[in-house]
Amino acid sequence: MTAAASTLALNLARKLYETGIRSQSVLSAVANTPRELFLDNALAHKAYENTALPIGQGQTISQPYIVARMTELLLQTQPNKVLEIGTGSGYQAAILAQLVPQLCTIERIKALQIQARQRLKRLDLHNVSFKYGDGWQGWHNKGPFDGILVTAAASKVPEALLAQLSDGGVLLIPVGEDAQQLLKITRTGQSFESQIIEAVKFVPLINGELA
């Protein structure tokens, strides 16, 4: 990161602290991640604003607050292996890869997946496995997962993701269409406990792959 970008990233982390993010590891990851790397040059000047931004293909890079909030919630159980549904730009994956031993991430849009893989390689983040595929189905061969984080809103909670949670594992997923809620679902044996965290606004989680 350039000195200017480093200062902006640190200021963003401070703003996130002011909005309620308390995990120092999450704030440090935000401060160490060049968000402009995950945006087109035309939007790079907005990289450290606390707002979602378009990345093409009808998708967005999530607001830094929600990235930090979901990451903080996920880390409460100290997960070893995490599945991300919706790689998108790769920014959320870059944050997670600094904080968990093993990250698996799925993207249904091939062009975005290729870009994200290149960006994480550039940041020397090598504990990430990438898959081009349908996020609704999860990644059965890599499961079970201690944590699953979904970066798009589902109309309902996908059964495949619940099945791929380990005992004690946590699924964080936005659910709903017009009115969306971020849910935290914890697995205990064959039971699942759901907690509403807060209202959110995400792009929809769509079935299938897009070349």
From Swiss-Prot:
One of its GO terms (biological process) is protein modification process. Its main location: cytoplasm. GO terms for cellular component: cytoplasm. InterPro entries: PCMT, SAM-dependent_MTases_sf. It is found in: Cytoplasm. Keywords: Cytoplasm, Methyltransferase, S-adenosyl-L-methionine, Transferase. Transmembrane segments: none annotated. One of its GO terms (molecular function) is protein-L-isoaspartate (D-aspartate) O-methyltransferase activity. Pfam families: PCMT (PF01135). It is an enzyme of class 2 (transferase). It catalyses: [protein]-L-isoaspartate + S-adenosyl-L-methionine = [protein]-L-isoaspartate alpha-methyl ester + S-adenosyl-L-homocysteine. Its EC number is 2.1.1.77. Disulfide bonds: none annotated. The active site is at residue 62. Belongs to the methyltransferase superfamily. L-isoaspartyl/D-aspartyl protein methyltransferase family. Catalyzes the methyl esterification of L-isoaspartyl residues in peptides and proteins that result from spontaneous decomposition of normal L-aspartyl and L-asparaginyl residues. It plays a role in the repair and/or degradation of damaged proteins. HAMAP family: PIMT (MF_00090). This is Protein-L-isoaspartate O-methyltransferase. The gene is pcm.
